[in-house]
A protein has these predicted regions:
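Catalytic core of pol beta-like nucleotidyltransferases
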Residues: 1-26, 34-40, 50-97
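Conserved histidines in hydrophobic membrane contexts and catalytic metal-binding motifs
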Residues: 29
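Short beta-strand->loop micro-motif that forms the acidic, two-metal-ion catalytic signature
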Residues: 45-48
Length: 97
């Protein structure tokens, strides 16, 4: 697994593409990678803000991120009406690029 700094750097480079292609306004990581507690088997938790994509588009974004980061990605859209515990974790641990 790549380091937290490598993941952040890769996401920074990907963000302009995500903004243009998918309407993503904010992109970041949260969870074990953001806290520096990841293991070789950890998924990379990626959060984003922006337009709500279709399931097909969401799958495309996830595939692009998994290829870019070389790991399984769990992709979560941050919004007001989401699970409050998950939202709190993202707000607490999240690192936006």
């Amino acid at each position: 697994m790549k380091s937290r700094d490598e993941i952040i750097s890769l996401l920074r480079r990907y963000k302009p593409t995500a903004q243009e292609k998918y309407g993503i306004s904010k992109l970041g990581i949260f969870g074990s990678v953001a806290r520096g507690e990841q293991t070789p088997d950890s998924e990379i938790d990626v959060c984003y803000e922006g337009l709500a994509p279709s399931f097909l588009t969401l799958d495309m974004i996830q595939s692009e991120l998994e290829q870019l980061l070389g790991s399984k990605v769990d992709l979560v859209r941050v919004r007001d009406n989401m699970n409050s515990l998950l939202r709190q974790r993202i707000l607490r641990d999240g690192i936006y690029v």
